[in-house]
Amino acid sequence: MRILKYLFLLLFLFLIGTSVFVSTQKGDYDVTRSIVIKNPRNTVFNYINDFRNWETFCSWIKNDNTYKFNYPELTMGQGASCSWVSSGTEGNLKTVSVKENESISQKMVNNEETSTIYWNFKDTIGGTKVTWRSKGKLDFKSKVAAFFHGGINSVVGDEYEKSLENLNKTLDYEINTYSVKVNGIVNRPGGFYLKQFLHCKQKDVDRNIKILVSRMEHFFDKNKMSSNGKPFIIYHKYDRTKDDIGFSVCMPVRDSIHIMPGSDIESGKLASYTSLKTTLTGDYSHTQTAWKKALTYSTDNHLERNNSGQIVEVYAVGRNDVKNPSKWVTEIYIPVFPKSVPKPVNRRSLDSLVVATPPTESTTP
């Protein structure tokens, strides 16, 4: 019994000593981890810049299926944000500033603890050097938890290392794995839709499409509207010489919807037309490759473009359907005139056709 009392006393003294020691330790932390990723800098930057992609590489999210994310209208660029709840945490993340292809600064609140996150991107031999840094201050409870797990630098640093490795694998496979198939001539059905129009430079097309698609989906959710299919893009102008691209991000609807004047959302109707269909399976960054293959097929098969039709990209399978970019499906429809089909020959006419027998040449002796 006396031994048991001594054990309890030792345990009590240990807990008191640990508490005093932990409480005197600085709660400030500054953790940095880096990795070289074998992808172009703009590809890596754009992927990290969009909060919707974080579920594919953050180790603490991938290892906990209780995480539920909420994504607002803007999820990439300055002012972007997201929030989450899980069995043990609740928090939000916001992008404070962005320097295109160079750096991202963010503020995170997790279980009422605030931290600052910095991302830096630099070209290097073999790809892009990505540096992930986090600064913050721990409360007493978090300091105790960190103490028993090797310290905050070890806890956060290990998670960052695992996440950066996940990011490297994700970008290496998910971004670089794709296929393009020219399906051939099809009839593209028409229908009603709501759209938002934008002009921009070619280098900004992909980023702006992501932003506008997210806004359109948010508009439908906010107004409790149902779409009649997948979002699609109509290209009105594609002037490479002047670097001027005009397009509309569209969401199909079952019936015509009246939109009040002054709104940046408009309604429209797409007529059905004959088109050359090409399917891209993979990340949107390979869209230009799919376009080139479609145009080459069109030229090789002497297809005539129908300029009265609309060039359309349909996001048949997107990020809301599956997180893996390698499984996304984009359908491209280029309007063309139907190829003329030779008129079938009437077999009866052939059978009854009288062929004149050529005269036999004769000679007079």
Predicted regions and their residues:
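Structural motif
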Residues: 41, 102-103, 127
